[in-house]
From Swiss-Prot:
<dbReference type="InterPro" id="IPR036264">
    <property type="entry name" value="Bact_exopeptidase_dim_dom"/>
</dbReference>
<dbReference type="GO" id="GO:0008237">
    <property type="term" value="F:metallopeptidase activity"/>
</dbReference>
<keyword id="KW-0224">Dipeptidase</keyword>
<dbReference type="GO" id="GO:0008270">
    <property type="term" value="F:zinc ion binding"/>
</dbReference>
<protein>
    <recommendedName>
        <fullName>Putative dipeptidase YtjP</fullName>
        <ecNumber>3.4.13.-</ecNumber>
    </recommendedName>
</protein>
<feature type="binding site">
    <location>
        <position position="174"/>
    </location>
    <ligand>
        <name>Zn(2+) 2</name>
    </ligand>
</feature>
<keyword id="KW-0479">Metal-binding</keyword>
<keyword id="KW-0482">Metalloprotease</keyword>
<dbReference type="GO" id="GO:0008777">
    <property type="term" value="F:acetylornithine deacetylase activity"/>
</dbReference>
<feature type="binding site">
    <location>
        <position position="116"/>
    </location>
    <ligand>
        <name>Zn(2+) 2</name>
    </ligand>
</feature>
<dbReference type="GO" id="GO:0006526">
    <property type="term" value="P:L-arginine biosynthetic process"/>
</dbReference>
<dbReference type="Pfam" id="PF01546">
    <property type="entry name" value="Peptidase_M20"/>
</dbReference>
<keyword id="KW-0862">Zinc</keyword>
<keyword id="KW-0378">Hydrolase</keyword>
<keyword id="KW-0645">Protease</keyword>
<dbReference type="InterPro" id="IPR002933">
    <property type="entry name" value="Peptidase_M20"/>
</dbReference>
<feature type="binding site">
    <location>
        <position position="85"/>
    </location>
    <ligand>
        <name>Zn(2+) 2</name>
    </ligand>
</feature>
């Protein structure tokens, strides 16, 4: 069978449906949540549109209270899972085109969710459609499981697997090719910096500080509001810093308050070194000013414990292993309010052989901050000799003529929600990863190639 030819036959429909899918703003918005739409109207619209497309094509579909859904084809006791998600991270600013216009330029579709994960989700859907339309005999059911809260708390899969059976094995089209069989553990933690009263009359009061939208994104913007007789002096110093460095920002005095804004570069938290943390940058500047005691303490904790360190060395939690590499640490959100104290939202990706308890114990014994929330998603590893891995290697090597090496990532995919699950694409080796960045895109050629790989993978696993 020539899987590439089958995909080319559906090329125009695949591109059209992918664009229409991407035009739905599916950023979680709990202000519009309600019965049957727990994560807001946009996420729900994206889920229902895909389920309706599945129903139209003759698949069995199911919506589980708006938390998740599935699209199924085939018969048998065993289930092959294809785990996708329709929610996306906030687009942020600085896009060349509207992040939800799904504009095509230079052979690419640009949109939030193009590569993470709505583009690959549509590729998987068309792969299943190809298997169905070719009337290929299957001995197992193939089930696309569609999540809606992957970018936040995974409440979708938690709800789904309370009500539905676990697939025998499966893959998530939500990372890199060839095959990812190891995923680091993921910790989301909040570190609280309690307010302490000033010992003397301050010359500059940190009124507020805010940076970051999600723990799994490096913050690309930060804002500090300052009051006091030192405003003009701090403003001048800030402008000098911008003039003499390559850092980007802006500042102004409005209604007696000094507002400082710093800009960085967002990226996925799995490798914070690919971005520039605007929150930490702004704290580094503020460290040089004469802030009030409480504000100074907040800034000091950030700079002492996180400046220039994405590996947790300053916190004494750094570690690594041969399977999955180094621990990474991202300060995804930074918040401070005068009289209330501060809070840092931390995202940690730790090696598959490491113990999260060691990290928790370190945080709980720290004197600089208090540990608030601590969420831990355990590491995931599937053996290299597992039939799932062997089958996907055969598919990849057969279609592309390249060795299907096994790799590990710091990102967390739905594959870890399965007992036997791996991530399989959509990002091909050598391609830049635009996920969670402005001007996110998917190469149309890669959309087609991944669809062909998914179609054969589905058939080989379920035949």
């Amino acid at each position: 069978m020539n899987w590439e030819v089958e995909v080319i036959r559906k090329k125009e429909d695949l591109i059209r449906d992918t664009q229409e899918f991407l035009r739905i703003n599916s950023v979680m918005d709990e202000t519009t949540a309600g019965p049957g739409k727990p994560f807001g109207e946009g996420v729900n619209a994206s889920l229902t549109s895909l389920l309706e497309l599945g129903e139209k094509e003759g698949f069995t579909t199911k919506n589980l209270d708006g938390f998740a859904g599935h699209i199924e084809w085939g018969e048998g006791d065993d289930i092959i899972g294809v785990l996708c998600h329709v929610d996306v991270v906030p687009p942020g600013d600085g896009w060349t085109s509207d992040p939800f216009s799904a504009e095509i330029r230079n052979g690419r579709i640009y949109a939030r969710g193009a590569i993470d994960d709505k583009g690959p989700t549509m590729a998987a859907f068309y792969a299943l459609k190809i298997v169905k339309d070719m009337n290929l005999p299957l001995s197992k059911r193939v089930r696309m499981i569609i999540g809606t809260d992957e970018e936040s708390d995974w409440r979708c899969v938690e709800h789904y697997f309370k009500h539905e059976e676990m697939p025998t094995m499966g893959f998530a089209p939500d990372a890199d090719f060839p095959i990812i069989n190891a995923e680091k553990g993921i910790i989301d933690a909040s570190l609280l910096i309690p307010h302490r009263p000033n010992q003397a009359e301050p010359k500059a009061v940190l009124v507020s500080f805010q940076s970051g939208l999600r723990l799994n994104m490096v913050p690309d913007a930060a804002e500090a509001v300052i009051e006091g007789p030192k405003n003009e002096e701090i403003l001048s110093s800030f402008k000098d810093m911008l003039r003499t460095t390559d850092q980007k920002g802006e500042a102004a005095i409005e209604n007696g308050q000094l507002i400082l804004r710093m800009y960085g570069l967002s990226c996925h938290a799995m490798e914070p070194n690919n971005g520039i943390n605007a929150g930490i940058l702004l704290c580094e500047f503020l460290q040089q000013t004469e802030l009030d005691d409480a504000g100074k303490r907040f800034v000091q904790v950030v700079t002492d414990k996180f400046s220039g360190d994405t590996r947790g060395k300053k916190l004494d939690i750094d570690c690594e292993d041969e399977i999955s590499g180094e621990l990474t640490l991202n300060v995804g959100t930074l918040r401070y309010k005068e009289g209330q104290g501060g809070e840092l939202g931390i995202n940690i990706r730790y090696p598959v052989t490491a113990e999260s308890k060691v990290i928790r114990d370190t945080f709980e014994s720290a004197s600089e901050f208090e540990l608030g929330e601590f969420k831990d998603s355990k590491p995931h590893h599937v053996s290299a000799d597992h039939p799932l891995v062997k089958t996907l290697q055969k598919v990849y090597e057969g279609q592309l003529g390249k060795k299907a090496d096994l790799i590990s990532i710091g990102g967390g995919t739905y594959a870890r929600s399965l007992k036997a699950g791996v991530a399989f694409g959509p990002l091909f080796p050598g391609r830049p990863d635009s996920a969670h960045q402005k001007d996110e895109y998917i190469e149309i050629d890669d959309l087609l190639r991944s669809t062909a790989l998914y179609a054969q993978a589905i058939y080989e696993l379920a035949k």
